[in-house]
UniProtKB/Swiss-Prot annotation:
Organism lineage: Eukaryota, Fungi, Dikarya, Ascomycota, Taphrinomycotina
Binding site for substrate: H196, N199, Y368
Protein name: Putative NADPH dehydrogenase C5H10.10
GO biological process, one term: cellular detoxification
Pfam family membership, one: Oxidored_FMN
Highest taxon listed in the record's lineage: Eukaryota
Organism: Schizosaccharomyces pombe (strain 972 / ATCC 24843) (Fission yeast)
Molecular function per GO: FMN binding; NADPH dehydrogenase activity; oxidoreductase activity
Amino acid sequence: MAVQKLYESQSKLFQPIKVGNMQLQHRMVHAPATRLRCLDNGLVMTDLVKEYYKQRSSIPGTLLITESLFSGAKSGGFSNIPCLYNDEHVEAWKPIVQAIHDNDCFVFIQFWNLPGELKVDYLEDQERLEKVTQGECPMDPTGLPAALGSAYSICGEELYVDKFMTKQDIQEHITTYTEAAKRAVFGCGADGVEVHQVNGFLLDKFVLNGYGDKCDPEYCGSLENRARFCLELLESVVNAIGQERVGYRISPFSDIWKDKDSFEAHVFMIKKIKERFPNLAYLHAIEPRQYWNGHVHITQEKNTLIYKNLWGDPFITAGGHDRDSAIQMAEQENTLVAFGRYFLSNPDLPFRLKYNLPLNKWDRATFYTKMSPKGYIDYPFSKEFLDTKKVE
C-alpha cells in the first residue's frame, strides 16, 4: 500500500543534513534515555539492547544517541546502568553499534558522571562496601551530604555518598572519560560521543556552582574556574578522537542547583566551547518544557534558540517536542530535533512523523523496568511502515 505524502513532508525536518562526519537523511534524532536494561555489573544485555536500537534505526540516515554510560568505576553507582571501561564492556557494545550501522544509521555514545551520590543498596554486600571504603565511589566537589535528596532517584533508589574531589581526582576523571571515548569510537565503532553537562550531574554541578567554594581553588569560585573541568575534559576527548566526533549536551533551564548565574554560565560555556572547538559535531540543548523529576515544566516565553544563535550550527533541541513543534524548530538553520518518549514508543518514529501517522502512547511504568523486554522492544511498527518493507 502506497503511503500518501503530505504537505508537511517537505519540511526541513525531513530533509538531509550533515552533522560532524555524518550525512543524515533527516533531522529527527533519538534522544539519550536511561532504561536500566543492563546487568548489575554494568554489562549491557547485548541481545535485548541490540534489538531495541536495531528497531529504532529502521529508517536509514537516523542519528541515535545512546543512553548514558559510566566511563569509569568511579563515575557511577546506579545498578543496571551500562559502563564502558573494560574490554568486556566493549565486546558487549560492538554488536549493538554494528546493528545500527547495518541499518545505515549513526550512533553517538553518551557518557555521564553522577554528582557524588550512590544508591542506598550499594552498601548491601561486602564486595561493594569494600569498593566504597577503598575510595571507589563517585566523586563530588563538596564532600558534603547530598544536596539533591529525593530529587535524584530511579525506581525509588536514592543516592547519598559524597567524596571531596581533589585536582588529582579531576584529572583521573578526565583520563577515564577520554579512555571511554576512545573505546566507544575505536573499540565499539561508534560514530562519536556526547559529553553530558546536564541536570545537575557532575560536570553541570561544577559549572553551576553547586558546591560553593568547597573544591580545589583552580576549579571553583569564578565562572572561568568552574568551567575549567569541562573545558579540560573536552580538550582531552577532542585530542583523542577528533572534534567532529564529539557532541555536547546542556540543560540551560534546569534549576537543580538554583544558580542565579545559570544563564551567564551557559553563555560563557557555549562561547568558550565554540571558540576552542569550532568543529564540534553539535550542541544539544534541552528545552524548558522538559519532563524532569516527575514534573512537567512548560515555559512558553523561553526556549533554546538564544543558545542556538550563540552556537551556530549544527544544533539539536530536545524536550517535550511533538510533530508540530519539531517542524517549527527545524525551520531554524541546521537545527535537528531529538525525541525521547516518542522514540522509545515508536520504533519507526521518523516515518510516522513524515507521513503524519498516529503515534503509539508510551507506558511510563516500563521506563525503568530493570532488564525487561516489556515496554522496551514490544512497541509495534506502523502498518504503513511494514507495508513499505513488503514492497521492498
